[in-house]
Amino acid sequence: MEKLKITGNGPLKGDITVSGAKNAALPILCASLLTADTLRLTNVPQLRDVMTTQKLLQGMGARVMTDNVHEFELSAAQVSDTCAPYELVKTMRASILVLGPTLARFGEASVSLPGGCAIGSRPVDQHIKGLAAMGADIVIEHGYVKARGRLKGARVVMDMVTVTGTENLLMAATLADGTTVLENAAREPEVTDLAVCLNKMGARISGLGTDRLVIEGVERLHGAEHAVMPDRIEAGTFLVAGAMTQGKLVLRNARAADMGAILDKLAEAGAVIEAGDDWIALDMPQRPRAVSLRTLPYPAFPTDMQAQFMAMNCIAEGVGSIKETIFENRFMHVPELIRMGARIDVEGNLATTHGVNKLSGATVMATDLRASASLVLAGLVADGTTIVDRIYHLDRGYEHIERKLGAVGAQIERTGG
């Protein structure tokens, strides 16, 4: 099993190019099911979850061409199987995103209930409720969500903010008869990126970036070209790495406009931030100051950056508190950080860190995608060598993280396999 070996090596300095956003790429890949024409995508990250989605679409009969690892051509003209099997869905929760587009175009879909990260239940009830409101007949049997019917426009009020739920219903509504209104929709930039791509394909979606999306159904969608947005979570992770090592980094292909809450907290920690349309620069001249934060839906602080900021708080000056309000069971990195010398108290969904001068290298185990990133960051500033095990979690969301960090001065290598 592959591992990362990291030895603390001082400040990170240099340029890093940010990859395309995984959480935008996955729904956009699934959107190819909405048309028989070709969808051309660029800036697609080379990640395990992307490859899983590719296999899922190909298993359904779609043609996926990729001459360049970051460019895809997808055609769903020959889709013959409207079932997403457990064998693929169990490894990636985002597989549920084929449900809406498949049902909308073919009138039926069968999708295994998902697996993925072990960070809470993340139920799909909002997806099912919304599709049922649009006229679908839905049953859950033998571990599968089975849906049939011609979709009709409806007003759907989501009980909670759900990114994948919003995306599934958004895609389904593009081909429904009549107008659909999604209330309490997720406002995440990745949802907006999907909507932009769908509009290029001929969809009629308004309200982009707000919590009220209005979709006028059309008879058919056509092909389009779209560049996947930059990954704001990858960008945030590298910026935290720069801050923790008291380094100086410039991120290319990064959009500061999508990262307000993250950049505000880095500035609060003492970082000097500059940004342009497609770049962000960070200079951290001193030890970070501890910050307190609460995870909430966009535009507030993202749950996917919680673990990384906790790693920074572990070596920061002062006491910081982190309240996780999105997912239960998302402090699984805490015992591993404590093994490295961190002082963290957890009570329910609140973690309080007391900054220490130094962490010490240890063998630690990744439990989910963002937890594994926090352990890598901790390893960058620890005395001695840190071994991060189970990095297949990391490969689900970070493209060649060891190469990118190594290019700016980190002593990090992949071993085993």
From Swiss-Prot:
UniProt xrefs under SUPFAM superfamilies: EPT/RTPC-like (SSF55205)
Pathway entry: Cell wall biogenesis; peptidoglycan biosynthesis
EC number, as in UniProt: 2.5.1.7
Keyword Cytoplasm: yes
Reaction(s) catalysed (UniProt annotation): phosphoenolpyruvate + UDP-N-acetyl-alpha-D-glucosamine = UDP-N-acetyl-3-O-(1-carboxyvinyl)-alpha-D-glucosamine + phosphate
Recorded name of the encoding gene: murA
BP GO annotations: cell division; cell wall organization; peptidoglycan biosynthetic process; regulation of cell shape; UDP-N-acetylgalactosamine biosynthetic process
Function: Cell wall formation. Adds enolpyruvyl to UDP-N-acetylglucosamine.
Naturally occurring in which organism (per UniProt): Laribacter hongkongensis (strain HLHK9)
Modified residue annotations for 2-(S-cysteinyl)pyruvic acid O-phosphothioketal: 117
Protein name, as recorded: UDP-N-acetylglucosamine 1-carboxyvinyltransferase
Disulphide-bonded residues: none
Residues engaged in binding phosphoenolpyruvate: 22-23
Predominant localisation class: cytoplasm
